[in-house]
Amino acid sequence: MTVKEPFSRFALRFPLTLGLGAVMLLLHDSLASGLFGALLPRNASAWELSKLAFFPPLLCLALTSRQSGGPGATLRRAAAPVVLGALLMAGFGTLAVSLTAETAAIMLLWIVLAALTLALAERWQGSPVWTVLLLALGAAYLRFSFRPPMLPPFLEPGDVAAMAPIAW
């Protein structure tokens, strides 16, 4: 089955992306160790939750790439929106965590960024620079899952002991 219209592809991909993100959150406790555990959010830090804006859209676009020109072309076009969505999730997530302890704000941000990422992935032109940035961000997610730096985006909001040295 090929879906020709961009809106139809979006209508297929958006719930799939949200479902994949929900599965990632559900698997968080049972698969928290090892390489696969590095793909899942390990805690409620903005960096870890930004994995929801990175891995589910990539997986969704890879799974549905036949509908829009094959895996290579689809992921090349999607590189910039996915990188920007994940970085915006980390940045605005850090701001949201500092302003409110509500995870609903972060989840709403994730839903909006997932929709924007998938919509832009249909229209963006591919570039090797964005593909390299996509790979670098993926490597950073793996690296910082095991040894995160002591910076606000990487710290769990409820961890007062970790946040104390950062306080002015």
Protein language model regions, located:
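Membrane-interface helix caps and helix-loop-helix hairpins in membrane proteins
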Residues: 95-104
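Hydrophobic cores of alpha-helical transmembrane segments in multi-pass inner/ER membrane proteins
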Residues: 17, 51-64, 110-122
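Alpha-helical transmembrane segments and their helix-start/interface "positive-inside/aromatic belt" motifs
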Residues: 2-15, 126-135
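Alpha-helical transmembrane segments
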Residues: 9-22, 84-85
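Membrane-interfacial loop-to-transmembrane alpha-helix junctions, especially the N-terminal start
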Residues: 10-13, 72-82
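C-terminal, well-folded lobe of enzymatic/effector domains
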Residues: 104-168
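Alpha-helical transmembrane segments of multi-pass membrane proteins
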Residues: 17-33, 142-148
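Short aromatic-rich membrane-water interface segments that cap or initiate transmembrane helices
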Residues: 38-52, 161-168
